[in-house]
Amino acid sequence: MDNKPAQNIQDTFLNTVRKDKTPITIYLVSGVKLTGKIRSFDKYSVLLENNSQEQLIFKHAISTVVSSRSVLHGDHRPGVAGHGAPPISPTPPAGTHSTPGESSGA
């Protein structure tokens, strides 16, 4: 069994584009468009480099991050079936279905 802690999709995406030095476009909530490569990131900010210039961008100001190529080929979200979580059943387990107006208590 894999004992590594699950990494959230945001960290997985940002870390992949950082390691691969993939050019990205960041759109801020104000509508400003920034381009460059991620040098680093933490819980609250992203360090973007473009033309040897660094910009520290606070995550609360970011609306969208767009990569110039496909980054996440599989579903890397924590808690998704196939990644350490049990499969999600589209129907309730037997004996748990109730009809409208029916009480489930004893």
UniProtKB/Swiss-Prot annotation:
Decide whether keyword RNA-binding is in the record.
Answer: yes
Q: Does the keyword RNA-binding apply?
A: yes
Q: Where is this region: Disordered?
A: 72-106
Q: Which residues form the Sm domain?
A: 11-71
> From what superkingdom does this record's organism come?
Bacteria
- One biological process term in Gene Ontology: regulation of translation, ncRNA-mediated
Q: What does this protein do?
A: RNA chaperone that binds small regulatory RNA (sRNAs) and mRNAs to facilitate mRNA translational regulation in response to envelope stress, environmental stress and changes in metabolite concentrations. Also binds with high specificity to tRNAs.
Quaternary assembly: Homohexamer.
According to UniProt, the name of this protein is RNA-binding protein Hfq
Q: Which organism is it from?
A: Acidobacterium capsulatum (strain ATCC 51196 / DSM 11244 / BCRC 80197 / JCM 7670 / NBRC 15755 / NCIMB 13165 / 161)
Which taxonomic lineage does the organism of this UniProt entry have? Bacteria, Pseudomonadati, Acidobacteriota, Terriglobia, Terriglobales
Q: Which gene encodes it?
A: hfq
